[in-house]
């Protein structure tokens, strides 16, 4: 039985990515823009029901919520060729339409005011036979995707504690390209929720997206549509085994379990090859299994700008699509081991996992074999350290804090900033510890320390001193 997934598209970036994603999915499942299955695709063995459900007239509707605080992007979707694809009851645009002003706290406050309405939308969508979890698409740099998305993560954790929460989170540029001057504040506040409330976070780094567009696709300056097309390619590829199941990784739990051996270090990097999008120059290349698997490991193809030559891989999953002989997989893995291309953790299994999946029979692709890598790497901690450094630059100058102090979240103090920084700093330390052979002992000591802190907090409450305690890290009181 298919395990259903509800997609939550939040903010401008989240909705633009989501639209590209659904465009790929309907092409791969032989569904038209109106949700009607094309005649040649009626007898397929693919699992459409994972991401779609059928209306009474048999047309397919995405299991998706479209959420934004300003109307421009969603209105454009409702006027596009996909206007009849969405369920109009699953669209939320703030009645005032003013947006969040690139302010995490404004987005978060809006969500606290509207969360019952949003949760009712999700509860109504949760009419599936076997809901497995949620996929959130958003940016952490702006106001709606970061702030509204943060509150949704907290509420989903509270209301659906046994469901998987995976995100595709776009991280800001670390260069002059970033147009949101307060993105370090927004990123730190959103990243705290991604650490505490998500089961897996696929990191999409804008810096790497533009580099890939410049170098691999030879686009002088990639548009949002082109970078979003790259992201949607990875999203579609990473969900292939859920929609075209094989022998392994047929559900979200299995997919994440193979990549996230420890609860907090659940951030993932990706790569895809061969990468082909509209508007970009095509390069004819060899697509043997070995060639694809080696290209997936090349730093220039990885969509996070933290490097992989130093540090270690915690886990790697290669999803290979096409008409592939399993013996080619074994030979390719052996060649990669012989050349010592990959450095793994010293305290766990050192192997690349491979999942095979069919190409969609309905979508024309210009290559015989394609691959998507999802990997957990210790150098992701460097990305978070970079965010903390940019945050510290603003925070030491107390720059732009007035717009945050005007919101209920920060009306009394700025403690939430420091709490978020502490949460991220702890994760950075964990990624450093992951590289050592003593990581398991380190983790046990950290766990014991947390237990001791909880016991001390409980004792303080019993003595009547609990009134000064701050709210728990997984939720925040207003």
Curated annotation (Swiss-Prot):
Chain intervals for the UniProt region annotation (Disordered): 451-478
> Which of UniProt's keywords are assigned here?
Cytoplasm, Cytoskeleton, GTP-binding, Microtubule, Nucleotide-binding
- One Pfam family assigned to this protein is Tubulin_C
GO BP annotations, alphabetical order: cytoplasmic microtubule organization; microtubule nucleation
- Per UniProt, where does GTP bind? 141-147
Listed GO MF terms: GTP binding
Statement: the UniProt record of this protein carries the keyword Endoplasmic reticulum: no
**What segments bear the compositional bias annotation Polar residues?**
459-468
**What GO cellular component term, any one, is given?**
cytoplasm
| InterPro entries in the record | Gamma_tubulin, Tub_FtsZ_C, Tubulin, Tubulin/FtsZ-like_C, Tubulin/FtsZ_2-layer-sand-dom, Tubulin/FtsZ_GTPase_sf, Tubulin_C, Tubulin_CS
Q: Does the keyword Nucleotidyltransferase apply?
A: no
Domain of life per record: Eukaryota
The positions making up the signal sequence are none
Intracellular or extracellular location(s): Cytoplasm, Cytoskeleton, Microtubule organizing center, Centrosome
Q: What is the annotated role of this protein in its UniProt record? A: Tubulin is the major constituent of microtubules. The gamma chain is found at microtubule organizing centers (MTOC) such as the spindle poles or the centrosome, suggesting that it is involved in the minus-end nucleation of microtubule assembly.
Family affiliation: Belongs to the tubulin family.
Name this polypeptide is given = Tubulin gamma chain
């Amino acid at each position: 039985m298919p395990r259903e997934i509800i997609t939550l598209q939040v903010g401008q970036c989240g909705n633009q990515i989501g639209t590209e994603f659904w465009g790929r999915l309907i092409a791969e499942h032989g569904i038209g823009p109106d949700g009607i299955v094309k005649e040649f695709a009626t007898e397929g063995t693919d699992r459409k029901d994972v991401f779609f459900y059928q209306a009474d007239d048999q047309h397919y509707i995405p299991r998706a919520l479209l959420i934004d605080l300003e109307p421009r992007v969603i209105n454009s979707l409702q006027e596009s060729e996909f206007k009849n694809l969405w369920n109009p009851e699953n669209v939320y645009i703030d009645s005032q339409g003013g947006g969040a002003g690139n302010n995490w706290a404004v987005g978060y406050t809006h969500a606290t005011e509207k969360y019952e309405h949003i949760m009712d939308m999700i509860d109504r969508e949760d009419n599936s036979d076997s809901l497995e979890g949620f996929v959130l698409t958003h940016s952490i740099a702006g106001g709606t995707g970061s702030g509204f998305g943060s509150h949704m993560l907290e509420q989903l954790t509270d209301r659906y504690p046994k469901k998987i929460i995976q995100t595709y989170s776009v991280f800001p540029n670390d260069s002059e390209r970033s147009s949101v001057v307060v993105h370090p504040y927004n990123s730190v506040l959103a990243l705290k929720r991604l650490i505490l409330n998500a089961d897996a976070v696929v990191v999409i780094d804008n810096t790497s997206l533009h580099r890939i567009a410049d170098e691999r696709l030879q686009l002088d300056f990639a548009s949002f549509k082109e970078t979003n097309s790259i992201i949607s390619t990875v999203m579609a590829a990473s969900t292939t085994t859920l929609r075209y199941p094989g022998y392994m990784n047929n559900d979200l739990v299995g997919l994440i379990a193979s990549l996230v051996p420890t609860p907090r270090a659940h951030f993932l990097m990706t790569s895809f090859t061969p990468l082909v999008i509209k508007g970009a120059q095509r390069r004819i290349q060899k697509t043997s299994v070995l060639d694809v698997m080696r290209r997936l490991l090349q730093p220039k193809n990885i969509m996070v700008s933290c490097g992989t030559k130093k540090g270690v891989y915690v886990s790697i999953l290669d999803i290979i699509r096409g008409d592939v002989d399993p013996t080619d997989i074994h030979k390719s893995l052996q060649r990669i081991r012989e050349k010592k291309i990959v450095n793994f953790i010293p305290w766990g299994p050192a192997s690349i996992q491979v999942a095979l999946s069919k190409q969609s029979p309905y979508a024309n692709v210009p290559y015989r074999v394609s691959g998507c890598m999802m990997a957990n790497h210790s150098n992701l901690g460097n990305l978070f350290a970079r965010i903390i450094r940019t945050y510290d630059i603003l925070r030491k100058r107390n720059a732009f804090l007035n717009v945050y102090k005007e919101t209920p979240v920060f009306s009394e103090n700025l403690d939430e900033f420091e709490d978020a920084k502490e949460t991220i700093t702890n994760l950075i330390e964990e990624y450093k510890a992951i590289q050592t052979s003593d990581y398991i002992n380190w983790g046990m000591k950290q766990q014991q320390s947390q237990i001791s802190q909880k016991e001390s907090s409980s004792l303080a409450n019993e003595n009547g001193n609990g009134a000064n305690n701050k709210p728990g890290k997984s939720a925040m009181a207003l």
